[in-house]
Amino acid sequence: FVFTPLEPEVDEWPEENKIFVRQIIEVELTLPTRDNAQDFFLIQPTIDLSVPNEEAYAEIRVNWEFDQDPRAERLSLIDGLLVQEVAGSIGLESITLELEVEYYGENLEGYEALSKSLQVVAITPEMAAYYVSLENIQNPSGFSLFSEPLLAYTNMSSGYGCFGVYRSIALPL
């Protein structure tokens, strides 16, 4: 995991006694691979204001204009990516993405106090199919309102209704 925060752009709004900060963080993430296995990962940037303030605003998101990796699928449901790792492929163990951070608040110290992280979640193929089906329901990509409904993926064959399992880690930025 390597991240490179670029120099933040700061705009001052003296009439409101506020600043607006925009910063790009370039991330190269090496994903674990297993032989003869199809692994899926959810990648979700998160940000947390350490001191809740009604007049402050902070957001972090994947920059969709950045070069898209064909293994990554945008999931607006989680404001992140679903990545399908290709087992046994040379040179495809890592993924590069660009995060865009925006902050509106009183001062630069407030921006620097933000807790930014990248949540990486390893999920089963069944759970990946579930997320994709939910994304298709939420964003039907041009389906007519009166077309056949899309069903959410389910795994009821075992009788337990378990979609899949996951493990996650939060990587601080």
Please give the residue ranges for each predicted region.
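A sequence/structural signal for flexible, mid-protein segments enriched
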Residues: 1-173
